[in-house]
Regions:
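Non-catalytic connector elements of ABC transporters
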Residues: 78-80, 87-157
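Alpha-helix boundary/capping detector
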Residues: 29, 41, 86-87, 95
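A generic "cationic amphipathic patch" detector
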Residues: 28, 49, 56, 62, ...
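C-terminal boundary and immediately downstream tail of ABC-type ATPase nucleotide-binding domains
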Residues: 63-88
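ABC ATPase nucleotide-binding domains
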Residues: 1-68, 72
């Protein structure tokens, strides 16, 4: 963790090569989720000494077991919105800050049991895009900072 970014990347590559060459089981302990995601076949996410989830990197990312895992895995981290689930005209909606966000039909079975309840909804940064006011599923907000990364731009709001 004390290595500069470029050296950290080369060390990850070298350790991964060694793992492949040796063909043995290795346990690598890190607090850096990028290292875990890029080097691990299976990852054990711990919180205060308790196992939260053990899975492949992509399953941790796409199907986190709980809010802690969802917020820990991924960089930039997952965004969380709090709101109330409602059913209106046959559609499932979440009211967030005066805006109704419509859920796709594919999520109906997972969400239906939460109608009328306050929930915390997580959304990955790559599923958010800047849009125009009034567009469907648009939240109004102010951009605080933009970080230009070359191939992508990270927007904080």
């Amino acid at each position: 963790s004390n290595l500069d970014a470029k050296l950290r990347v080369s060390m990850r590559v070298r350790i991964s090569q060694l793992h492949k060459e040796l063909g043995s089981t290795m346990i690598y302990v890190t607090h850096d989720q990028v290292e875990a995601m890029t080097m691990g076949d299976r990852i054990c996410v711990l919180r205060e000494g308790k196992i939260m989830q053990v899975d492949t990197p992509l399953n941790l990312y796409n199907h986190p077991a709980n809010k802690f895992v969802a917020g820990f895995i991924g960089s930039p981290t997952m965004n969380f919105l709090n709101g109330v689930i409602e059913e209106k005209d046959g559609k499932l909606l979440m009211k967030v800050k005066g805006t109704e966000l419509e859920f796709p039909e594919s999520m109906r079975e997972k969400i239906k049991g939460h109608t009328g309840k306050e929930v915390s909804f997580g959304i990955r940064p790559e599923h958010i895009s800047l849009g125009k006011e009034g567009e469907q599923n648009a939240l109004k907000g102010n951009i605080l900072v933009k970080e230009q990364m070359g191939n992508e731009e990270i927007v904080y709001f």
